[in-house]
Amino acid sequence: RQDKLDDALGFLDAEAGVPPGSSEAPSARYLSGLIAVRNNDLENALSLFQDALKEASKAREAGRTEYSDRVYRQSVLGIARVYYELGSRLGPESPEGAKALQQSALHFRMVPRFTSDWGDAIFERGWVHFQLGEFGKSLGSVHSLSAPFFAENAQHAESYVLKMTNYFYNCQWDRVRRTLGKFQKAYGESVPKLEAFLGSKPQEAGDIWWYEQLKASVTGPAAEAVIPQVLARTVASNNRYARLSFFLDALTSEAAALRAVDLFKGELAGELLTAMDEAREALEPFMGRL
């Protein structure tokens, strides 16, 4: 975060920093790959993401899945995206470029189904097929994103752009116009609704208000959501937000369980409940700002 990338690489290095086979090796190799991408060293990035994938696979086989599952998915995405960039630079008309794009599509398909990264993988694979001139497969990716699993839980507004681009390149102007109309219908009402919400916070309300409104929009009826529900669920699916929200819900349920048991009424229970309440009261406003 301080942009000291060389220092970071020193700590993440397989020999001088985080050794292979350690519990942090998958994350270390993955972060090193991100730095290589930042430095525009795509060949090295590809190698590091492949190392991260191997380390994450070994961790999963050993039963260490708490973090390795996500690193596995992110490493697969990293490999797919690097291949896409390499293929785009070389051009799909060259054998090397076409091969890189085909490898990109292959790795996007490796992202496990029904995970938080599945939708992104399908969408980005659609652009790979477009680059390869496989317009039917590209439109198939867009069609997949209209399934209820995706349409009800996260917004994919960019899929309309991909769809229109496919039609445009095939001179299907009427379908371009129809798709644009569908986009405006789907998202045209969301923008003013979102703008109205952003200006509706009561003056006396604290930052926690934003968090409360988001939670209500995610879980309540779509017609009553003050934030367009698909947008609210997109925000709530953010990895950092989801982890903090899970922690907050756990604090609330644990505190309720403690208060419900007569055995936990002594001084220690009081101190524990006070600590839980203080942690929750500090985190909720932060969640609103986040």
Residues covered by each model-derived region:
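"A position-specific structural signal for the A-helix of alpha-solenoid helical repeats
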Residues: 1, 30-31, 38, 71, ...
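Short solvent-exposed coil/turn linkers within tandem alpha-helical repeat scaffolds
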Residues: 2, 12-26, 54-71, 110-119, ...
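Hydrophobic/aromatic packing residues within the alpha-helices of TPR/SEL1-like helical repeat arrays
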Residues: 12, 49, 56, 84, ...
